[in-house]
Amino acid sequence: MSSKRTLWLLAGTVALVVVPLLMGGEFGGADGQAAELIEATVPGFAPWADPLWEPPSGEVESLFFALQAALGAFVVGLVIGRRQGAAKTREQNAPAPRSFPAE
């Protein structure tokens, strides 16, 4: 990957992180937003299922979310790396092009 492309990707990533902070964006979970929307739409709604286990605190919940994200990033990186390695192996093992003598 060229260094110019790497710089553009890095700048885009930084922009995705910084722009919401500068705009005063609020970081909230989708679960809370969904619960608010359901409560506004259907007052008195009672969920029909309960979680099997609730983490003891928000920090533990954040830890599990971060671990899940790290595991997902690892799997995606592993798949991309394996595919890239397989492509390089195929390229190295490809037969050399044959040249025919000119007549």
UniProtKB/Swiss-Prot annotation:
Pfam hit, one: CbiN
Transmembrane regions listed in the UniProt entry: 7-27, 60-80
InterPro entries from the UniProt entry: CbiN
Topological type in the membrane: Multi-pass membrane protein
Any one GO molecular-function label of the UniProt entry: cobalt ion transmembrane transporter activity
GO terms of biological process kind: cobalamin biosynthetic process; cobalt ion transport
NCBIfam families: cbiN, PRK02898.1
Purpose: Part of the energy-coupling factor (ECF) transporter complex CbiMNOQ involved in cobalt import. The complex confers cobalt uptake upon expression in E.coli; can also transport nickel with a very low affinity. A Cbi(MN) fusion protein has about 70% import capacity, but the holo-Cbi(MN)QO complex cannot be isolated, suggesting CbiN may destabilize it.
Family assignment from sequence similarity: Belongs to the CbiN family.
Protein name per the record: Cobalt transport protein CbiN
Source organism of this protein record: Rhodobacter capsulatus (strain ATCC BAA-309 / NBRC 16581 / SB1003)
